[in-house]
C-alpha cells in the first residue's frame, strides 16, 4: 500500500480528530487511580468521545494481524503489558501500577492516535525513570520527523535514547501512518533491528504516529491468552508514549498535543 500525502486542509482535519484524542486521553489519564477498573476508564473514553461527536477508532477495528475485531475503545496495558491490553471490569488498578493508555478517534472522516503512560499513585524510582526515558525518546524521535530524513532516523533516535537509560526498545512493534485510517503505511519501528530494506524517505504531507515502547529488561514479547494483550517476555515493566505528527516544510507539527 502506498504512503499517502495530505494537503494542508486535510492535515487540519486530522488535527481536529487528534485534538479530540488528546482531550479524551487527558481526561482518562486523570482518572487513573488505585481502585479504578480499566473498564471504568473505557466507559469514560466512550462517553467523552461521543460528547465530542467523534467515534472511537479502535472499537470494532480489525487489524491485519487478527481474525477478530477489537472490542474496546481503549488499549490499557499495565506493568509488564506493552500494548493492546483489553479493558476489563475485573482488571482493577493498584497503587504503583504503570498504566499505558492508547486511544484513537475518527472525526469527519479522519483519524488521530496517541498514547500516554502514567503511574497510579506513587510509583517506584525505576518506573519513574522508565516513563521519563520513553517520553524523552518520543520527543527526540519527533525532532527527526523532517522532509528528507528516513523512517529509520526516527527509529535510531528512539533506540539511542533507550540505550542511554539502559532500557530496551520493543521488537516488531512501532508507529505507523495516520490519516483517512488510524493505521496506514509506513511502519515506523522502535527497534533498529526492524529497519530492514524498507526504509522510506519522509516527505512533506506525510502524517505518522510515532510511538516508542520501552522496557526495563527485554526487547522480546509474548502474547497473552486473551488474543490481544502483548507482554514483555521476562515480565519487566514497559511504557508507551505516542503522538500523531505531521511532516511539514517548517518541521514536525504535533497534532495530538493539547
Curated annotation (Swiss-Prot):
<comment type="subunit">
    <text>Monomer.</text>
</comment>
<feature type="binding site">
    <location>
        <position position="176"/>
    </location>
    <ligand>
        <name>a divalent metal cation 2</name>
    </ligand>
</feature>
<keyword id="KW-0031">Aminopeptidase</keyword>
<protein>
    <recommendedName>
        <fullName>Methionine aminopeptidase</fullName>
        <ecNumber>3.4.11.18</ecNumber>
    </recommendedName>
</protein>
<dbReference type="GO" id="GO:0046872">
    <property type="term" value="F:metal ion binding"/>
</dbReference>
<dbReference type="GO" id="GO:0004239">
    <property type="term" value="F:initiator methionyl aminopeptidase activity"/>
</dbReference>
<dbReference type="GO" id="GO:0005829">
    <property type="term" value="C:cytosol"/>
</dbReference>
<dbReference type="InterPro" id="IPR001714">
    <property type="entry name" value="Pept_M24_MAP"/>
</dbReference>
<feature type="binding site">
    <location>
        <position position="102"/>
    </location>
    <ligand>
        <name>a divalent metal cation 1</name>
    </ligand>
</feature>
<dbReference type="InterPro" id="IPR000994">
    <property type="entry name" value="Pept_M24"/>
</dbReference>
<dbReference type="GO" id="GO:0070006">
    <property type="term" value="F:metalloaminopeptidase activity"/>
</dbReference>
<dbReference type="InterPro" id="IPR002467">
    <property type="entry name" value="Pept_M24A_MAP1"/>
</dbReference>
<comment type="similarity">
    <text>Belongs to the peptidase M24A family. Methionine aminopeptidase type 1 subfamily.</text>
</comment>
<dbReference type="GO" id="GO:0006508">
    <property type="term" value="P:proteolysis"/>
</dbReference>
<feature type="binding site">
    <location>
        <position position="113"/>
    </location>
    <ligand>
        <name>a divalent metal cation 1</name>
    </ligand>
</feature>
<keyword id="KW-0645">Protease</keyword>
<feature type="binding site">
    <location>
        <position position="84"/>
    </location>
    <ligand>
        <name>substrate</name>
    </ligand>
</feature>
<dbReference type="Pfam" id="PF00557">
    <property type="entry name" value="Peptidase_M24"/>
</dbReference>
<feature type="binding site">
    <location>
        <position position="211"/>
    </location>
    <ligand>
        <name>a divalent metal cation 2</name>
    </ligand>
</feature>
<keyword id="KW-0479">Metal-binding</keyword>
<feature type="binding site">
    <location>
        <position position="113"/>
    </location>
    <ligand>
        <name>a divalent metal cation 2</name>
    </ligand>
</feature>
<feature type="binding site">
    <location>
        <position position="242"/>
    </location>
    <ligand>
        <name>a divalent metal cation 1</name>
    </ligand>
</feature>
<comment type="function">
    <text>Removes the N-terminal methionine from nascent proteins. The N-terminal methionine is often cleaved when the second residue in the primary sequence is small and uncharged (Met-Ala-, Cys, Gly, Pro, Ser, Thr, or Val). Requires deformylation of the N(alpha)-formylated initiator methionine before it can be hydrolyzed.</text>
</comment>
<keyword id="KW-0378">Hydrolase</keyword>
<feature type="binding site">
    <location>
        <position position="183"/>
    </location>
    <ligand>
        <name>substrate</name>
    </ligand>
</feature>
<feature type="binding site">
    <location>
        <position position="242"/>
    </location>
    <ligand>
        <name>a divalent metal cation 2</name>
    </ligand>
</feature>
<dbReference type="InterPro" id="IPR036005">
    <property type="entry name" value="Creatinase/aminopeptidase-like"/>
</dbReference>
Amino acid at each position: 500500500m502506498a504512503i499517502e500525502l495530505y494537503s494542508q486542509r486535510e492535515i487540519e482535519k486530522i488535527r481536529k480528530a487528534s485534538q479530540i484524542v488528546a482531550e479524551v486521553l487527558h481526561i482518562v489519564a486523570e482518572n487513573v487511580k488505585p481502585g479504578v477498573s480499566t473498564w471504568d476508564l473505557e466507559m469514560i473514553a466512550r462517553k467523552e468521545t461521543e460528547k465530542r461527536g467523534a467515534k472511537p477508532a479502535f472499537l470494532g477495528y480489525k487489524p491485519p494481524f487478527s481474525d477478530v475485531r477489537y472490542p474496546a475503545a481503549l488499549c490499557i496495558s499495565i506493568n509488564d503489558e506493552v500494548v493492546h491490553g483489553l479493558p476489563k471490569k475485573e482488571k482493577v488498578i493498584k497503587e504503583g501500577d504503570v498504566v499505558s493508555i492508547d486511544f484513537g478517534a475518527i472525526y469527519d472522516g479522519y483519524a488521530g492516535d496517541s498514547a500516554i503512560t502514567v503511574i497510579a499513585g506513587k510509583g517506584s524510582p525505576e518506573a519513574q525513570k522508565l516513563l521519563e526515558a520513553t517520553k524523552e525518546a518520543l520527543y527526540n524521535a519527533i525532532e527527526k520527523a523532517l522532509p528528507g530524513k528516513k523512517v529509520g532516523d526516527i527509529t535510531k533516535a528512539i533506540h539511542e535514547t533507550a540505550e542511554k537509560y539502559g532500557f530496551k526498545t520493543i521488537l516488531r512493534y512501532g508507529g505507523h501512518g495516520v490519516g483517512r485510517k488510524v493505521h496506514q503505511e509506513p511502519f515506523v519501528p522502535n527497534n533498529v533491528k526492524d529497519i530492514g530494506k524498507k526504509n522510506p524517505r519522509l516527505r512533506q504531507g506525510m502524517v505518522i504516529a510515532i510511538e516508542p515502547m520501552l522496557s526495563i529488561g527485554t526487547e522480546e514479547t509474548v502474547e497473552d491468552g486473551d488474543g490481544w494483550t502483548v507482554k514483555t517476555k521476562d515480565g519487566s515493566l514497559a511504557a508507551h508514549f505516542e503522538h500523531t505528527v505531521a511532516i511539514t516544510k517548517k518541521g514536525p507539527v504535533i497534532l495530538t498535543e493539547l
